[in-house]
Amino acid sequence: MIAFASAEPQDVAPYLGHLARFCESGNLVDRWKKHPGGNHPDGWGIAYRQEDEIRTIRSGVPAASDPLLGQLQVRTDRFVGHVRFASNPDTVRAENSHPFAWKGIALAHNGTFYGKVGEEGDARKVSDTLVFLELLSERWKERTLPGLSVALRDMLSDAEMVGKYSAANLLIATGERLFALRRYRRDDEYYTLYARTGKKTTIVASQPLDGGPGWRLMENGELLEFAGAHSPSALLAGLP
């Protein structure tokens, strides 16, 4: 996963290149069976802000081999990108690629939810992430960092709702606001999120995008708002 917020619109082509690289060789848990086409070959998607709207483009084709990726010409100041490793290969199609968009919120997720969220996803034959997003849109009343912190804490503490989820690494965009949550229950070396903040651009990615300085590993339970050099964060401590 990759997301950035910048003071001025910028070309997303370099970030699309990183998505293609993550598709081919991004981190993978050793015990997982590798799928044909790379480490994360089961579709890709982006969400970006244009004219105060969040727009999405999604594909069920591996990012590393999809010609659409190289054809996109997008400049934006808010961006979310995701390449997918599907726990169930039968679900690989564009409509199951992240990010999902619902009622003005875009959400990309690494991990799997169980409980009622997972059951509803199976019954509707949709992603558990989409079901989670629909619930989040109802519960997130105040579209701020404190408001999101309350909503996510309540949802992730509800074992009946999300079960013993593997991780809730989330990138969340709404309007001009962009947030990242790193939350894992296992496989900490896989469910990573690194942040680099600056005056003009804040970036969060599953792995550092380059060897330059400034990357830091987000804490487990850390919720970060993209807001320049002094991006605020909250720690959702004590989650089950």
Language-model features, listed with the residues they occupy:
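Short histidine
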Residues: 114-177
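Short helix/loop capping segments that flank catalytic or ligand/cofactor-binding pockets
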Residues: 13, 56, 89-91, 109, ...
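Short, basic and Ser/Thr-rich N-terminal targeting/leader segments
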Residues: 40-44, 50, 63-64, 74, ...
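Short acidic (Asp/Glu) patches
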Residues: 58-73, 81-103, 116
